[in-house]
Amino acid sequence: MRIYPAIDLMGGKAVRLYRGQKEKVKVYGDPVEIASRFTELVDKIHVVDLDGAFTGKPQNLDVVKEIIEETGLKVQVGGGFRSYESIAKAYEIGAENVIIGTKAFDLEFLEKITDNFDGITVSLDARGGKIAVKGWLEESSLKVGEAYEMLREYVDRFIYTSIERDGTLTGIESIERFWKDEEFIYAGGVSSVDDVLKLRRVGFSGAIVGKALYESEVSLKELLEVLEC
């Protein structure tokens, strides 16, 4: 199991939102400097372009490029990737994985990008067990398991985000495994060693950790050490 430190970008800065609400934002500073803190412990991080998620088009790829070039870290990046051109640009600047959410349910588009790019990752963002789209602003009628069954023939790498938990430090929901052999990464309120161990028991291949690291609720070193046991 892997730990992916998270950096959320807004206006070129590293920020965190409370439950995905852009009105409730806390600024943490220079994203390149923050990314550099992780280089001794991990080789890959999770980056979300929040401006892109809300506008439908990536706005901070220059910052993502700088992170990659300055730190040497591998990056999985999401936020507003709803066109072939924006996805191509992300790979061009050095991203290892591009995360798509809203456009994943356009199966013709999904087939096209998975035919042309490796590492496409689908984010299943859930509120109340239902998939949320367009920067979490709209809720669909699809349940998470239904969305997974629809998309699994196209991709083998997923991120499951519990929106209610995102950035709230309240721990994880009770989740039963519904996926099979795919790489499944969890995001949303991971804030303790116990959370990470529970996710590993369920069968998640990774956990994305953001606010808990910034607020010193848990250290990256602690999480990595317990996973070695």
Swiss-Prot record:
InterPro entries cross-referenced by the UniProt entry: Aldolase_TIM (IPR013785), His_biosynth (IPR006062), HisA_bact_arch (IPR006063), Isoase_HisA-like (IPR044524), Isoase_HisA-like_bact (IPR023016), RibuloseP-bd_barrel (IPR011060)
Reaction(s) the record says it catalyses: 1-(5-phospho-beta-D-ribosyl)-5-[(5-phospho-beta-D-ribosylamino)methylideneamino]imidazole-4-carboxamide = 5-[(5-phospho-1-deoxy-D-ribulos-1-ylimino)methylamino]-1-(5-phospho-beta-D-ribosyl)imidazole-4-carboxamide
Gene Ontology BP term (one): L-tryptophan biosynthetic process
Keyword hit for Amino-acid biosynthesis: yes
Domain of life from the UniProt record: Archaea
Molecular function in Gene Ontology: 1-(5-phosphoribosyl)-5-[(5-phosphoribosylamino)methylideneamino]imidazole-4-carboxamide isomerase activity
Record bears the keyword Coiled coil: no
Annotated metabolic or biological route of this protein: Amino-acid biosynthesis; L-histidine biosynthesis; L-histidine from 5-phospho-alpha-D-ribose 1-diphosphate: step 4/9
One Pfam family matching this protein: His_biosynth
Keywords annotated in UniProt: Amino-acid biosynthesis, Cytoplasm, Histidine biosynthesis, Isomerase
Record's subcellular location: Cytoplasm
Family the entry assigns: Belongs to the HisA/HisF family.
Protein name (record): 1-(5-phosphoribosyl)-5-[(5-phosphoribosylamino)methylideneamino] imidazole-4-carboxamide isomerase
Organism: Thermococcus onnurineus (strain NA1)
Gene from which this protein is expressed: hisA
